[in-house]
């Protein structure tokens, strides 16, 4: 009986730990997706494209699974919080205030919810992105 109980307990522990490995892997890949979208946004330097890249990064990360969606939310929220702080010191350089931050968060949520990020894609943005 003790052997049976031990085997059940070990299988439960291993099952839970494998879920954590999956979550962590998804989170790392999701963070990479967010970085890639940010890097593409900086490279493209295309007017009115930031909402598209916000939505795309969140969409790509969320497609990884719960870990990717979690990473996308954490990174997006941290980015918007830091933007609000920098706006206090240098308005306009890091965004356009509260309205822009709310629009960014809406684009983030749009992407995380699985909706098509191309909804925010500006016309004329090169196909590379």
UniProtKB/Swiss-Prot annotation:
InterPro entries: Serum_amyloid_A, Synovial_Prolif_Regulator. Pfam families: SAA (PF00277). Transmembrane segments: none annotated. Keywords: Acute phase, Amyloid, HDL, Pyrrolidone carboxylic acid, Secreted, Signal. GO terms for cellular component: high-density lipoprotein particle. Residues 92-129 are annotated as: Disordered. It is found in: Secreted. The modification Pyrrolidone carboxylic acid is found at residue 19. GO terms for biological process: acute-phase response. Expressed by the liver; secreted in plasma. Gene3D superfamilies: Serum amyloid A protein (1.10.132.110). Residues 1-18 form the signal peptide. SMART domains: SAA (SM00197). PROSITE patterns: SAA (PS00992). Belongs to the SAA family. Major acute phase reactant. Apolipoprotein of the HDL complex. This is Serum amyloid A-2 protein.
């Amino acid at each position: 009986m003790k052997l049976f109980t031990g085997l059940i307990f070990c299988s439960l522990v291993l099952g839970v730990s494998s879920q954590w490995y999956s979550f962590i892997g998804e989170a790392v890949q999701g963070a990479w997706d967010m970085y890639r979208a940010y890097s593409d946004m900086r490279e493209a330097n295309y007017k009115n494209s930031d909402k598209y890249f916000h939505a795309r990064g969140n969409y790509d990360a969320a497609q990884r699974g719960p870990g990717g969606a979690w990473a996308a939310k954490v990174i997006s929220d941290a980015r918007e919080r830091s933007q609000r702080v920098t706006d206090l010191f240098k308005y306009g350089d890091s965004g356009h205030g509260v309205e822009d931050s709310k629009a960014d968060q809406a684009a983030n949520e749009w992407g995380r919810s699985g909706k098509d990020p191309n909804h925010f894609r500006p016309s004329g943005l090169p196909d590379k992105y």
